[in-house]
Amino acid sequence: MPQEHRANAILPCSDLDASQAFYERLGFALASDYGHYRILSDGSGWHLHLTQTSGGWLMPGHNPFGIYLYVEDVDAVADRVRELIIEPGAPHMKPWGTYEFAVSDPDGVLVRVGRSH
């Protein structure tokens, strides 16, 4: 059987516990724990790798990395993180045709959650 092609993000984290708790609210669960390196899964094929890092890699407000999570029930996910949503009143339709909202993870990574219409 051929190997499935996919890509996984590896996110540097200043606090693994805080990052894991944040992504669990977005629907991920711990799949593997190697101490300083954790793998989260959504149960449908997504994997997110979190790695403990020391300071110096992050400039607050200037993190150039982001993640887009496509989900069917955007509103259900938004309800789990309502107080963290960046734009008040979100989720909403964007001019480019997605229904989405955005949050920042504990290290300032932009996380957009949405679906195409």
Task: Annotate each PLM feature.
Residues 1-18, 65-67, 114-117:
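N-terminal beta-strand motif that seeds the catalytic metal site of vicinal oxygen chelate
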Residues 4, 35, 96-98:
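Loop/turn position at the start of each blade in beta-propeller repeats
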Residues 14-17, 67-110:
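Vicinal oxygen chelate
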Residues 24-31, 85-86:
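Conserved acetyl-CoA-binding loop of GNAT-fold acetyltransferases
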Residues 29-62, 110-115:
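Conserved short beta-strand elements that form part of the metal-binding/catalytic scaffold
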